Amino acid sequence: MNKQLLIASALLSANLTHAADFELSGYVGLEWREHFEEGQFNNANNEQADRQLGLTAEPEMVWSLADGEQTIVFKPYVRIDSADDERTHGDIRELSWMTYGDDWEVTAGISKVYWGVAESQHLVDIINQTDFVEAPDGEDKLGQPMVKLSFIRDWGTVTGFVLPGFRERTFPGDEGRFRTELSMDIDNAQYQAGEEDAHVDYALRWNHTIDDYDVGFSWFNGTSRDPIFAPARTSGELVPFYAQINQLGIDLQATLDSWLWKFEAIYRTYDDSVKNDFDQLGTLTQRDFGVENYTAATGGFEYTFYGPFETNWDWGVLAEYQYDSRENGSIAIGQNDVFLGSRIAFNDAASSEVLAGISQDLD
């Protein structure tokens, strides 16, 4: 287990000795993945699975202390996969203590934070690392050690983050699907920061609702959650490299009757030393690593038909456009792409819904 997670666990354990209201919820799930074509990267040593069976569990325990003025949340997660050893893993999604006053709120421990409004990609959502072995869509996140302080004012909410410790991205193993052609050397990840995964990151966000409009501005400084992949000199594997970045973000959503108009964008910068190093490496390997300052944006709409055909469910149609200023489309996912999708919300107690979509490169 990550050493930052152990420290956060120890800090919270003492609070549980006091009398508290307790609530237990969560889920246990079975998953069946069937791949109708052989793995693209099968070889004499490894064969990608055509079928994957999985068991998942994510219980959530909530303790309410001091007449509800303090809350402790513990949410572990575990997955067992029949084919991919890297996908068999566990994580502490949340282990946090929260308290609040009239116009402020503090959270300390391991937690998850979501920023953004778009469906097809999440540009501004940078606090938590992606749990990529779960799914390639970036929806699943690892727990992040943090101290979060929010101030609530009439003109908006300002939230500051101190993020002590970094979580490396998870990747499928050689037998898994949605993997790269070259194997991933996750045991020897490289960092720009001398502190490596002990580097302390910082973030700041302001968000506010003005009539029918939700707006947010964010700033992040620290270790990028998106690794750069460089080939190892001897093994022929890919080595993740985590650079230091500054990122500015904006997200907007307008709720106008049955329409949801969505937009989010970022501007990300790297240190000149890192850009120069990867430019030189790119010259030697004839590759474009995409390490340059860039702008990316996603915008579009969702229109909802409420109760069509006299049913209790709602049907939404979505369309979004994705832009990235980097010229190399193989590096920039969503450089000049369009996303079309549909959502069915069943409006039941479990908030069940089905979301499906497809992205198309316009180049």
Over which residues does each language-model region extend?
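Outer-membrane beta-barrel translocator domains and adjoining extracellular loop/strand segments
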Residues: 36-45, 83-91, 120-125, 171-177, ...
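Residues that define the transmembrane beta-barrel architecture of outer-membrane proteins
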Residues: 47-57, 88-93, 141-145, 152, ...
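Residues on the lipid-exposed face of transmembrane beta-strands in outer-membrane beta-barrel proteins
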Residues: 30, 57-63, 94-99, 147-151, ...
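Transmembrane beta-strands of outer-membrane beta-barrel pores
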Residues: 30-36, 63-67, 76-82, 101, ...
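Detector for outer-membrane/organellar transmembrane beta-barrel domains
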Residues: 222, 258-275, 279-361
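Extracellular loop and loop/strand-boundary signature of outer-membrane beta-barrel proteins
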Residues: 42-47, 79-83, 131-135, 188-192, ...
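Transmembrane beta-strands of outer-membrane beta-barrel proteins
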Residues: 22-28, 70-74, 106, 158-160, ...
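Outer membrane beta-barrel
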Residues: 62-178, 211
